From Swiss-Prot:
Source organism of the structure: Xenopus laevis
Coiled-coil features, chain-numbered ranges: 9-102
Protein name: Charged multivesicular body protein 6-A
Claim: Coiled coil is one of the keywords in the record: yes
Region (Disordered): 166-200
């Protein structure tokens, strides 16, 4: 039983799949970093407000400078995430294009083999022969319909009538002579009935 599970077919992972996975992992890490920076910016803004309220203007100003720098990092992170996502889309689309190209390649090979069996010259020859056959039959039809005279038509009708009559004629009587003896049953049937004598 263990061998059955050990021999389970493994899915094929290509280099493109690995690249896409790595890019998505980097994108996710950048998004986590963005989330962390955003929360930190919110805390620093609240802290700067508190420092101003306490009269510590210089410290608040220094904190806002740090906040501004982090905002610039956040903007760069957005650009990096966009680049990663675009790269993922490009790779995935390239994989689709490769499959399409492979399909076209197989189709072209199939067409080449078909063309080797049936060349253009062969197709033209068959079409010419077909057209010649149609033209020949048309000429025969024209000859049959146009060259017959009225006498020919009458002779054809007479022959057709004669053939029809032959099919309708009754079969001839048998040529063998009839038997001389009457069958026994027929003789009994024809035997005269006895006459009854009247009482005196």
């Amino acid at each position: 039983m263990g061998n059955l599970f050990a021999r389970k077919r493994r899915s094929r992972v290509t280099e493109q799949d690995k690249a896409v996975l790595q890019l998505k992992q980097q994108r996710d890490k950048l998004k986590q970093y963005q989330k962390k920076i955003t929360l930190q910016l919110q805390r620093e803004r609240e802290l700067a407000k508190q420092l101003l309220h306490d009269g510590k203007k210089e410290k608040a100003k220094l904190l806002l400078k740090k906040k501004r720098y982090q905002e610039q990092l956040l903007e760069k992170t957005d650009n990096q995430i966009s680049n990663l996502e675009k790269m993922v889309e490009d790779i995935e689309f390239a994989q689709i294009e490769m499959k399409v190209i492979e399909g076209l390649k197989v189709g072209n090979e199939c067409l080449k083999k078909m063309h080797e069996v049936m060349s253009i010259e062969e197709v033209e020859r068959i079409m010419d022969e077909t057209q010649e056959g149609i033209e020949y039959q048309r000429q025969i039809d024209e000859m049959l319909s146009g060259s017959l005279t009225a006498e020919d038509e009458e002779a054809i009708l007479e022959e057709l009538e004669a053939i029809t009559q032959e099919d309708l004629e009754l079969p001839e009587a048998p040529s063998e002579p009839l038997p001389d003896t009457i069958p026994e049953k027929q003789a009994v049937k024809n035997k005269p009935k006895p006459q009854m004598i009247a009482a005196s």
